[in-house]
UniProtKB/Swiss-Prot annotation:
InterPro entries: Cecropin (IPR000875), Cecropin_insect (IPR020400). This is Cecropin-A1. The modification Arginine amide is found at residue 62. One of its GO terms (biological process) is defense response to Gram-positive bacterium. The gene is CecA1. One of its GO terms (cellular component) is extracellular region. It comes from the Eukaryota. It is found in: Secreted. Belongs to the cecropin family. Keywords: Amidation, Antibiotic, Antimicrobial, Immunity, Innate immunity, Secreted, Signal. The keyword Zinc does not apply. The keyword RNA-binding does not apply. Residues 1-19 form the signal peptide.
């Protein structure tokens, strides 16, 4: 029973220590994912602008 308590305590300390040291690595991945999301958003906005202008171009071409 005493071994179990010591094991849980050591595991908890290890988890806290590793979690704090790995935050930089996780933050870098989060920033990359956020950047991809921003690029996707910007491309979608540009695509919608082109799609909204297409009917005007078609109407102008018909006369």
């Amino acid at each position: 029973m005493n071994f179990y308590n010591i094991f849980v305590f050591v595991a908890l300390i290890l988890a806290i220590t590793i979690g704090q040291s790995e935050a930089g690595w996780l933050k870098k991945i989060g920033k990359k994912i956020e950047r991809v999301g921003q690029h996707t958003r910007d491309a979608t906005i540009q695509g919608l602008g082109v799609a909204q202008q297409a009917p005007n171009v078609a109407a102008t071409a018909r006369g």
